[in-house]
């Protein structure tokens, strides 16, 4: 885990993110074929999965997105992942794809799309599920339900994918770094790294995205001034000028939207 003390559940570290090629039909085309009433404001999905508890009386996840997101060119009903049928664990035979938003909006094992005249109120759309306080809140303070907002576009974030944390590096050898960055509905305009705990930053080479909602690859190399313990921090900035914070951002009940700078440890010898 990258948290201390570690959170419960799967310790995915940096393994809970990927960028895939999806093939399908635009959700917009399907909805327009069926007809969209002027009163439509949201879509919701129902799927073939069951509640994690196995209790048939409990509703499984049923989330949704506003119509403006549902009608984007990139929002799909997908049947292929990286050129092959979607694997069962990823939602075969059909999956909703709402890129740039929480993955829970991209429902697996899709069997029904609802067009709603109100915000969808399915399972995991209310309470603290995928919702955060609308205004900054002191840690642990109660938040009225009316003051909780549904998470939409994900914040700017980057990862160092090479090397792994904890390596040894010889002082005389430059260290190659690389990773990925993304910014929800926005694009990434810059990535920088620091080896002195944020006192100074070195700009990285940033590759363009293959499309509007795909992640971007970055790379650079660093040299160290002396032997000892170092941390490498990565910080991305989006096209609206927002950068990753160096500490965990504002508190929320479930710990969502933590886009603090990723960091790795290096022992220079």
Question: Model-found features: residue ranges?
Answer:
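Structured, non-membrane catalytic/scaffold regions adjacent to prosthetic-group chemistry
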Residues: 1-269
């Amino acid at each position: 885990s990258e948290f201390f003390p570690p959170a419960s559940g799967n310790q995915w570290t940096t393994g809970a993110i990927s960028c895939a090629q999806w093939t399908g039909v635009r959700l917009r085309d399907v909805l327009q074929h069926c007809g969209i009433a002027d009163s439509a404001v949201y879509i919701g999905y129902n799927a073939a999965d069951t509640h994690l508890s196995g209790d048939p009386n409990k509703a499984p996840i049923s989330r949704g997105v506003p119509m403006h997101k549902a009608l984007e060119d990139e929002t799909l009903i997908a049947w292929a992942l990286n050129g092959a049928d979607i694997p069962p664990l990823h939602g075969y035979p059909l999956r909703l794809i709402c890129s740039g938003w929480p993955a829970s909006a991209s429902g697996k094992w899709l069997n029904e799309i609802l067009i709603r005249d109100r915000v969808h109120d399915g399972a995991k759309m209310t309470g603290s599920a995928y919702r955060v306080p609308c205004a900054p809140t002191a840690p642990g303070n109660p938040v009225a339900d009316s003051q909780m907002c549904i998470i939409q576009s994900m914040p700017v974030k980057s990862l160092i994918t090479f090397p792994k944390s904890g390596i040894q590096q010889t002082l005389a050898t430059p260290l190659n770094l690389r990773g990925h960055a993304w910014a929800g509905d926005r694009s990434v305009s810059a990535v920088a790294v620091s080896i002195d705990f944020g006192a100074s930053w070195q700009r990285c080479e940033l590759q363009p995205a293959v499309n509007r909602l795909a992640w971007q690859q970055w790379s650079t190399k660093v040299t160290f001034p002396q032997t000892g313990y170092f941390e490498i921090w990565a910080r991305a900035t989006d096209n609206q000028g927002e950068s990753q914070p160096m500490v965990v951002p504002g508190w929320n009940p479930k710990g969502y939207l933590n886009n603090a700078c990723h960091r790795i440890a290096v022992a220079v010898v």
